From Swiss-Prot:
Reactions catalysed: 2 (2R)-3-phosphoglycerate + 2 H(+) = D-ribulose 1,5-bisphosphate + CO2 + H2O; D-ribulose 1,5-bisphosphate + O2 = 2-phosphoglycolate + (2R)-3-phosphoglycerate + 2 H(+)
Location of N6,N6,N6-trimethyllysine modifications: 5
Identification of the protein by name: Ribulose bisphosphate carboxylase large chain
Protein's gene: rbcL
Membrane-spanning segments: none
Length: 469
């Protein structure tokens, strides 16, 4: 008889392979699967493997024209999620030949494409990916990385300080530049375009770039420090985005910016390549991430988006504060912060890391802390995240009762005091408030900031928490 038999067969007969031993070259994925009632977990896991690789809903004769064993995804392990009814972690291995080299876009189109609308599943979430060394080497990665950035800025041994200019929309270019100048003059390393500042009627991009460049050159001359402003090059087309990046380079600024999720991975990778070739650092904002990553049972965890960004390219990325107004549990956040910064990260389920990840020669990314943070948070931020991070105080700078420059002074004094105390062996977690109070005795700017924000708390539990072990 003919080898082809038409009809529908269960996915698990082909795609559930518990005996499979993963290869070093496989891309491995951990999915949180919530099957529909009556669908066994093995069938659900196999369906995910099939629909995100070579499978379709029925047997087709063209399967015989290729080697399914070589190209199919395999669900090789399933485990129940502790404390959750009808939720499972399904581990899927994908052969490397399924993916185009150097394309995050293609990787995601396969792994998190149509399968997320699959009717046999009530919900599906991609918790983690293991990117093999062979695939990692196909990417340029961050435009420059942590060490090159420090060398360009000549700033070592402490976190970098930033500030998002507010109000985020409505300022004219000249007033915007004035706010930038005041912040940089006061002691910040960077100021930032808000993610939704592109080129609107009240402030066209070219005017903003010019006034911001004037501001940071003036602040550099006055302080003797290298300064920067993240000029947001995000635009409606890739061509327009690159045009803005070219103008930023012509102005001699050190850093540009992109909204990588709304702009898209193809645009982001193009911009990262341009920045590497032309000496620009690249700051990345994650606008839209919570649409994808906030719900615990459906979507994609931010650690996956963070890994994807390191492949696509970016020198900074916003990554949760733990202590501010935006979502972020401590152990989970530190897990993906290490995935951004370190060369090699061991599997550690207590921090949500499902796979050991080796980044080989890919440069690291500086995690950015922003959103509802102020001077009283400085000891915790310094202690939790260490030197290799960017601390960004928007309202926590511009909301100072005396203005932007004193707000910047307050943050710089608080940071220097915390770094000095840490280097002297003091415990920032236990003595943080005392360290800030001591510093405020000789800094009136810090004293005023301490008074304004002494009662501010954002005491809400994180939605996306770790599973019980």
């Amino acid at each position: 008889s003919v080898g082809f038999k038409a009809g529908v067969k269960e996915y698990k007969l082909t795609y559930y392979t518990p005996e499979y031993e993963t290869k070093e070259t496989d891309i491995l994925a951990a999915f949180r699967v919530t099957p529909q009632p009556g669908v066994p977990p093995e069938e659900a896991g196999a369906a995910v493997a099939a629909e995100s690789s070579t499978g379709t809903w029925t047997t087709v004769w063209t399967d015989g024209l290729t080697s399914l064993d070589r190209y199919k995804g395999r669900c090789y392990h399933i485990e129940p999620v502790p404390g959750e009814e009808d939720q499972y972690i399904a581990y899927v291995a994908y052969p490397l030949d399924l993916f185009e080299e150097g394309s995050v876009t293609n990787m995601f189109t396969s792994i998190v494409g149509n399968v997320f609308g699959f009717k046999a599943l009530r919900a599906l979430r991609l918790e983690d990916l293991r990117i093999p060394v062979a695939y990692t080497k196909x990417f340029q990665g961050p435009x420059h990385g942590i060490q090159v950035e420090r060398d360009k800025l000549n700033k070592y041994g402490r976190p970098l300080l930033g500030c998002t200019i507010k109000p985020k929309l409505g300022l004219s270019a000249k007033n915007y530049g004035r706010a930038v100048y005041e912040c940089l003059r006061g002691g910040l390393d960077f100021t930032k375009d808000d993610e939704n500042v592109n080129s609107q009627p009240f402030m066209r991009w070219r005017d903003r770039f010019l006034f911001c460049a004037e501001a940071f050159y003036k602040a550099q001359a006055e302080t003797g420090e290298i300064k920067g402003h993240y000029l947001n090059a995000t635009a409606g087309t890739c061509e327009e985005m690159i045009k803005r990046a070219v103008f930023a380079r012509e102005l001699g600024v050190p850093i540009x910016m992109h909204d990588y999720l709304t702009g898209g991975f193809t645009a982001n990778t193009s911009l990262a390549h341009y920045c590497r070739d032309n000496g620009l650092l690249l700051h990345i904002h994650r606008a839209m991430h919570a649409v994808i990553d906030r719900q615990k049972n459906h979507g994609m965890h931010f650690r996956v988006l963070a890994k994807a960004l390191r492949l696509s390219g970016g020198d900074h990325i916003h990554a949760g504060t733990v202590v501010g107004k935006l979502e972020g549990e401590r152990d989970t956040t530190l897990g993906f912060v290490d995935l951004l910064r370190d060369d090699f990260i061991e599997k550690d389920r207590s921090r949500g890391i499902y796979f050991t990840q080796d980044w080989v020669s890919l440069p690291g990314v500086l995690p950015v802390r922003s959103g509802g943070i102020h001077v009283w948070h400085m000891p915790a931020l310094t202690e939790i995240f260490g030197d290799d991070s960017v601390l960004q105080f928007g309202g926590g700078t511009l909301g100072h009762p005396w203005g932007n420059a004193p707000g910047a002074v307050a943050n710089r004094v608080a940071l220097e005091a915390c770094v000095k105390a840490r280097n002297e062996g003091r415990d920032l977690a236990a003595e943080g408030n005392e360290i800030i109070r001591e510093a405020s005795k000789w800094s009136p700017e810090l004293a005023a900031a301490c008074e304004v924000w002494k009662e501010i708390r954002f005491n809400f539990k994180a939605v996306d928490t770790l599973d019980p072990s």
